[in-house]
Amino acid sequence: MFTGLVQAIGRLEPSSHGIWVRGALEGLGSMALGDSIAVDGVCLTVAEMDAAGGGFRADASEETLSRTTLGRRAQARALVNVEPALRLSDRLGGHLVSGHVDGLGTVLDIEPLPSSWRLSVAWQDPSYGRYICEKASLTLDGISLTVAGCEAGGVSFWLAVIPHTWEHTTLKQRRVGDAVNLEVDLVARYLERLLLDQATTEGATPTQAPLTAHWLADHGWASGSPHA
C-alpha cells in the first residue's frame, strides 16, 4: 500500500527486463531487493539496485507497460514519481493507494491560478466516471489529489494543485493531451461491491439496482429521508 505522497523523482529508462529508474534512491531512504515501490502510481517490485548510479530496476510485464504510461515514458526517458511502500508506523498524509492503476486519463487543460493550478482530466474509458465526485480522493501518476469538481457523470473532472505538489512532482512536466495513470479511491470500489452484493441478494441484477440517494437511504447507508 502507498499514500500518494511522492518521495522522489527519477528518470525512467527501458530495460529488457522491465524498467530502470535512475536518480531516485537518494530520496527513498533504505530500500532492499524485493521491496514494493510505486512508479507513477504503478506498484512494482525492486529486482536490482545500482547504488553507484542511484537507481533501481523493477520487473514490469508487457501488460503493465502497455496498459499504463510506463511503456511510452520509458522509451521517452521521462521523469517519474516514486514512492516506497507504506509502513504501518507511517503517517497517512494522503490516502490509501494500492498501486493498481484503474485506467488512463487525458489531460484536457492546465490553468495557472493566483495560488494554485487547475488540472482538467477526462477518463479514456468513460465507465470509470461513476467513481468520481466532488471532494473524492484520486491518484494521478502516483500523486494523491482531491477532485475539485466534475461533469458528464464524472467522466471529466478537475483537480486543484497546490504549489508544493506542483514543484515536487512531475505535474509541471505534463502537457495538454498527455496520458496519465489514474486510480480511484479504494473506498469507492469496496462500497460499490458491498452495495451491489446487497442489491443482488434482494433479487435485482446489478443493472437493475442503481446506487441512488433513495436506495442508499432506504438501505441505511445515508441519513435522512430522501422522500422529504
Predicted features and spans:
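Conserved loop->alpha-helix
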Residues: 1-228
